[in-house]
Structures are given as structure tokens and as C-alpha cells.
Amino acid sequence: MIPVSLVVVVVGGWTAVYLADLVLKSSVYFKHSYEDWLEKNGLSISPFHIRWQTSVFNRAFYSWGRRKARMLYQWFNFGMVFGVIAMFSSFFLLGKTLMQTLAQMMADSPSSSSSSSSSSSSSSSSSIHNEQVLQVVVPGINLPVNQLTYFFAAVLISGVVHEIGHGIAAIREQVRFNGFGIFLFIIYPGAFVDLFTTHLQLISPVQQLRIFCAGIWHNFVLALLGILALVLLPVILLPFYYTGVGVLITEVAEDSPAIGPRGLFVGDLVTHLQDCPVTNVQDWNECLDTIAYEPQIGYCISASTLQQLSFPVRAYKRLDGSTECCNNHSLTDVCFSYRNNFNKRLHTCLPARKAVEATQVCRTNKDCKTSSSSSFCIVPSLETHTRLIKVKHPPQIDMLYVGHPLHLHYTVSITSFIPRFNFLSIDLPVIVETFVKYLISLSGALAIVNAVPCFALDGQWILNSFLDATLTSVIGDNDVKDLIGFFILLGGSVLLAANVTLGLWMVTAR
């Protein structure tokens, strides 16, 4: 949930700003000087909204807009084509997202929750891996509070790049550019450009399209550049960090099951999960997925060692149907099952580390027939979704983790980048990588959402200009053309509102 302290700071801060603004504007002594100061600095204040506009950057915008005229013409032509395609594609994307949300709501409904625990676990796991392209983000709920800096920085940069696109395109089409500004609405930052509306209305629909599509076009290009930077990050950081030999532990949560004297520590290099080699973050995630979805793997043990370590036990069934044969309070012993030479399933309680250390993994006794001595494949008898995982992090002794693989995934932070020198921070590549991922996601989302033909978004003006450019010669009656545009806008607005409303409900009500 959203921390109460954060809400108090935000509401309290805005209340103080608004009251101070109200008092100064009401004061006989400060009213005129305060309003002159606001006007001089391009500031305007209203409840939960601060806006700053300046003409300082006008010279730079005009310089960019008049440089390489032919290249800019082609650049914004590409943007116009992209914008029109994105506008119509957004209907399909929003429709698909809405269907996914409805399907997820039906899957989570009480009527569907009567299925077995294994099938519900499978469906919840699959939903993790089939995430929607568009998803509502609520700080403190599905956006970690400790990543708000990345989020808002990426939002601001995406907004600035978006508006720079509009500004340069407008100057290229001979529309007067009045200024550039930044605003803060509650906690969300953004940017805007001030264009001379009369000039904008006098140019042709195609010219208008180039201007209106420029913002989402620049966001799309920024997202592509972010993807390129993410792919090339190992090469960019190669002089300082190397990759491909394992994953480095950067943080272990205080409540993580991996904490302990023989657990994982910051700076450990993990090379294997069970028999699954780990060379990067993707390998780590794939190995954990495989371990979670496949049956518990076994370990080969010789008959003599098994006889030496085992002792008489009384097995009993747990509530989930699995078998337990050790003391519930034991921190070192684990119940194992195996088949003897007569193919009879037996259970024995063994000290876990001695049983699985320096042994090969197996599925059946046949996998252990590598020597003349008799061997058995012993499999940990654990609760349904619990796994025993041997984590190799040399030179330390292997960690034996018992729990759900997802708990290891969510409570241990890792990176593929290993510093070449001791003075280098292990967090720097993570910071860069995380920020670039946010920039890709938010810039791409800004391009998609703004392309939707919806009231008050770029999509509204893109649609109007597109209809003016294509239907004016076909439909002589402007009222009919406007009616067509209105119904398309209405459909896009309803579709977007439905996605946002249901998305918020899914995020906050679950």
C-alpha cells in the first residue's frame, strides 16, 4: 500500500503551497509584487498544480527547427505515417488489453476459485509471464516506492522529448512558437509547448498531422534508442564491468529465506541453481521457472551412505497429501523418498547437507548407475510448491534453500555485471539498467496512449487532421465528417476509460 507518510507529505506540501499563494494574493502589501513576480518568472499556481513557462529556449527551438530543412521534412513525414498507423493500431491494442483484463477478472472470480490448488498456482504463475502490454501503474501498489525516482525522472524526460518533437515540427511548418514549459500535477511531472493557435489553424491538414504526430514519433524513437542502449549496455560498460560468468547478489531482503550463516550475501557470485548453469539474470529467472514448474529433482546417494545416515522414522501425510517423516522443528533434516531394489517407495529422514552435498542430480535410480556400487535416487518429500534448491556461489559452501522458488526470486536482487575493480559500485549498472527500462516503458506507453483517438489527447487532433486530409474531397458535408470523427473519438475515449478503470480496480482491489 501507499505509505501514509508519503500521502501526508504530498497533501501537506500542496496545502502549504496553495495557502501561501492564497495569502500572498490576498495581502494588500504583497499582492502586486507577488503577482508581478509570478508573471515575470512564468509561474502559475492552482490546487495541486504548478506550471512554469519560459521563452529562454525559443532561440534553441528555432535553431533546431530551421536546420537541415529537407532532412526534417522527411523525418516528420515518417512521424506522420507512424502516427496514423499508431492511432488505428491503438484500438486493437486497447481492445486486446481490455479482453485480457476481463479474462483475468473472470479467472480471479470466486466461481473460478473452486479449482484445485495446483491449477490455481499454475494460472497465477502463467499470468506473471503473460503480462499485458499496457498496465495501470499506481505508486506504492504495483510500483515500488524505492523506484519512484526512476519513474518520475523517466516520465519527465519522456514528456520533454514529446514536446520537443511538437515544437520543432511546428517551427518547421512556420507556426509561431511562444514558449516551452514544465508542470507538476500532484506528484506527476510533465512538459508542454505553447504554439500560436491561429497559425496552427491556417496551415494544411497534412502540415497539422506532421506537428500532432511529432510527439508520439519522438517517444517511439526514444524507446527504440533505450532498447538499443539496453542491448549494448554490456559493451558500453565493458571497460569497467564484465558479464557471462554468473549473477552478482546486490541485495537480500531482511525477510528473505536466503538469509543465514550459510545463505547469500551481497557480493556473492551465483553460478548454478541445482544443475542449471547461471550466467546472467535471464538464466537465473529461467532456472527458477524450470525448478518451480518441474517436479522436485533428486540426488544420488550410495546405499552405504544411505544406511549410515538414515534412522528409523514414522511417516505421515501432510494436509496437501505429501509425506513427512522428520521432526517438524528440525532445521537441518529433510524427509526424502526413494525406491529400493524391489521398486518399493520408502521414506527416510536425512541431514540435508550431507545427503545432497557433492552428489549428482537424478530423476530415477537409473540415473545413478554410474559405478559398480549400489546407489539410489533420493527425492526431497516437501509440500506441493516447496522445493529444495542447491545454490552454488563459490568459493562459499553451497546454500541449501527450502521454500517456494518465487520467494527466492522476489527477495534476492541480482545483476549480470561484475566489477573489474574493487572501487567500482555494484549498484551502478543496476541503476542505469533500471532507469533505461523505465524510460523504454514510459516513453513507449506515452506514444501508445497519446495516439488513441480520445478527447484531450494528441489522438484527437491527429484524427481530426487525418479526416480533414482524407474525407474533405469525398464527403462534402462537414457536419457528416465531424459526426464520424465524434463517434470515433467517443469509441476511443470509452475504450481507454474502460481500460484505465478496470486496470485500477485490478491493481487496487486485489
UniProtKB/Swiss-Prot annotation:
Lipid bilayer topology: Multi-pass membrane protein
Binding-site residues, Zn(2+): 162, 166
Binding note for cofactor: Binds 1 zinc ion per subunit.
GO biological process: bone maturation; cholesterol metabolic process; membrane protein intracellular domain proteolysis; mitotic G2 DNA damage checkpoint signaling; positive regulation of cholesterol biosynthetic process; positive regulation of transcription by RNA polymerase II; protein maturation; regulation of response to endoplasmic reticulum stress
Gene Ontology CC, one term: Golgi membrane
Keywords tagged on the record: Cholesterol metabolism, Cytoplasm, Glycoprotein, Golgi apparatus, Hydrolase, Lipid metabolism, Membrane, Metal-binding, Metalloprotease, Protease, Steroid metabolism, Sterol metabolism, Transmembrane, Transmembrane helix, Zinc
Localization, UniProt: Membrane; Cytoplasm; Golgi apparatus membrane
Glycosylation sites: 328
Entry keyword annotation includes Glycoprotein: yes
Record's catalysed reaction(s): Cleaves several transcription factors that are type-2 transmembrane proteins within membrane-spanning domains. Known substrates include sterol regulatory element-binding protein (SREBP) -1, SREBP-2 and forms of the transcriptional activator ATF6. SREBP-2 is cleaved at the site 477-DRSRILL-|-CVLTFLCLSFNPLTSLLQWGGA-505. The residues Asn-Pro, 11 residues distal to the site of cleavage in the membrane-spanning domain, are important for cleavage by S2P endopeptidase. Replacement of either of these residues does not prevent cleavage, but there is no cleavage if both of these residues are replaced
Superkingdom as given in the UniProt entry: Eukaryota
Gene Ontology terms, MF aspect: metal ion binding; metalloendopeptidase activity; RNA polymerase II-specific DNA-binding transcription factor binding; transcription regulator activator activity
Disulfide bond entries: none
Primary site of residence: membrane
Transmembrane segment boundaries: 4-24, 75-95, 96-107, 136-160, 165-177, 178-200, 220-242, 438-455, 456-467, 484-504
Topological domain ranges for the Cytoplasmic compartment: 1-3, 505-510
Cofactor(s) the protein needs: Zn(2+)
EC number(s) from the headed UniProt entry: 3.4.24.85
InterPro entries: MBTPS2, PDZ_sf, Peptidase_M50
Function field: Zinc metalloprotease that mediates intramembrane proteolysis of proteins such as ATF6, ATF6B, SREBF1/SREBP1 and SREBF2/SREBP2. Catalyzes the second step in the proteolytic activation of the sterol regulatory element-binding proteins (SREBPs) SREBF1/SREBP1 and SREBF2/SREBP2: cleaves SREBPs within the first transmembrane segment, thereby releasing the N-terminal segment with a portion of the transmembrane segment attached. Mature N-terminal SREBP fragments shuttle to the nucleus and activate gene transcription.
Record-stated family: Belongs to the peptidase M50A family.
Name listed for the protein in its UniProt record: Membrane-bound transcription factor site-2 protease
